[in-house]
Swiss-Prot record:
Tissue: Expressed in roots, leaves, flowers and siliques.
Binding site for heme: C346
GO cellular component, as recorded: chloroplast envelope
Gene Ontology BP term (one): response to wounding
Similarity annotation: Belongs to the cytochrome P450 family.
Cofactor(s) annotated in UniProt: heme
Induction: By wounding.
Keywords from the named record: Heme, Iron, Metal-binding
Protein name: Probable inactive linolenate hydroperoxide lyase
Molecular function GO labels: heme binding; iron ion binding; monooxygenase activity; oxidoreductase activity, acting on paired donors, with incorporation or reduction of molecular oxygen
Length: 384
């Protein structure tokens, strides 16, 4: 971190209005040299640590509801669009595990909270994101010309704020008493971690993962099913320890992150003049220049990855495969790195891959086969 500054560069040289966060500069917009950064990152990491007590239970409980919805839709319509049911599942799961709140204590939040976050996220990222819904010149004129005001979502965001304020007392006291945050700072940062980092990240990544598996016709499902059931024996044996023994499951998760990183662009500004080297060249970087890392390009480096344009499910299996984790940068750092209060690596780096692996293992304890793509599921065959 001595070479680059991460101040206000989450999505480049554009920062959404602080009105989206109640006027608070949340942790993601702080550089590591700013005093509040260590406190907020520490709060996020401790919140994740404490959530481990209920993480698996809440994940599987909400997956039960999700898959029940999907099965019902398939029986009625012959197929099920799963994006919105999955987002509702993710929201409910994260409220319970991160904030320690059952979303159902507020019927309005349980029904509409995830929709509010979708709008809140969209208003922040649309000014710089390529959507592809209209021809590019029109997209630039119509969508990328101005920032969107937080006023458009302020009322519904306030409902989420009040929901956390009224129900997440234990988590908020952690931020206040152990990390010296004001209650408002704790609420705004918890909402950002829950809504932007976790919910937003999972909403992008998990459909890619599910789509890879459900759309595969190479025999991958049979291989995963065999591994999961060999390790688990029965559904009651799925836990953090057993899922870590599933080399193929974890490799599929890593390979999906390599192909489809949830945050494809990462930015930083040079603190000083320095040189940056590639395999065959050296580039001069001047102080103050904004640097952009395009992850899909970085993680398809032919000097590192064999056949980088091919999706290889078992790429990370074995000792040789595990060495490639040094070059898996989806989390703003290598998969072998360690998030800390002094760096900007994703605090949930390990819990993201663990959660995705648990989802895959849970899927193949429920079903023998599943057919679909990144947006819909067409058929499931229940485990015999």
């Amino acid at each position: 971190m001595d070479l680059v500054d991460k101040r206000d560069v989450l999505i480049g040289d554009f920062r959404p209005s602080l009105g989206f966060y109640g006027g608070v500069r949340v942790g993601v917009y702080l550089d590591t040299t700013e005093p509040k950064h260590a406190k907020i990152k520490g709060f996020a990491m401790e919140t994740l640590k404490r959530s481990s007590k209920v993480w698996l239970q809440e994940l599987r409980s909400n997956l039960n509801i999700f898959w029940g919805t999907i099965e019902s839709e398939i029986s009625k319509n012959g197929a099920a669009s799963y994006i919105f049911p999955l987002q509702r599942c993710i929201f409910s799961f994260l409220c319970a595990s991160l904030a320690g709140v059952d979303a159902s204590v507020s019927p309005d939040i349980a029904e509409n909270g995830w929709k509010t976050i979708n709008t809140w996220l969209a208003l922040q990222v649309i000014p710089t994101a390529k959507l592809g819904v209209v021809p590019q010149p029109l997209e630039e004129i119509l969508l990328h010309t101005w920032p969107y005001p937080s006023l458009l979502i302020a009322g519904n965001y306030k409902k989420l704020y009040n929901f956390i304020d009224e129900n997440a007392g234990d988590c908020l006291r952690l931020g206040q008493e152990e990390f010296g945050l004001t209650r408002d700072e704790a609420i705004q940062n918890l909402l950002f971690v829950l809504g932007f980092n976790a919910y937003g990240g999972f909403s992008v990544f998990l459909p890619s993962l599910i789509g890879r598996i459900t759309g595969d016709n190479s025999g991958l499902q049979e291989r995963i099913r065999t591994e999961v059931r060999r390790v688990c024996g029965s559904g009651s044996d799925l836990n953090f320890k057993t899922v870590n023994e599933m080399e193929l499951v974890k490799s599929v998760v890593y390979e999906t992150l390599r192909f489809s990183p949830p945050v494809p662009l990462q930015f930083a500004r040079a603190r000083k003049d320095f040189q940056i080297s590639s395999h065959d060249a050296v580039f001069e970087v001047k102080k103050g220049e904004l640097l952009c890392g395009y992850q899909p390009l970085v993680m398809r480096d032919a000097n590192v990855f064999d056949e980088p344009e091919e999706f290889k499910p078992d790429r990370y299996v074995g000792e040789t495969g595990s060495e490639l984790l040094n070059y898996l940068y989806w989390s703003n750092g290598p998969q072998t790195g360690t998030p800390s209060a002094s760096n900007k690596q994703c605090a949930a780096k390990d819990i993201v891959t663990l959660t995705a692996s648990l989802l895959v293992a849970d899927l193949f304890l429920r079903y023998d086969t599943i057919t679909g793509d990144s947006g819909s599921i067409k058929a499931v065959v229940k485990a015999k």
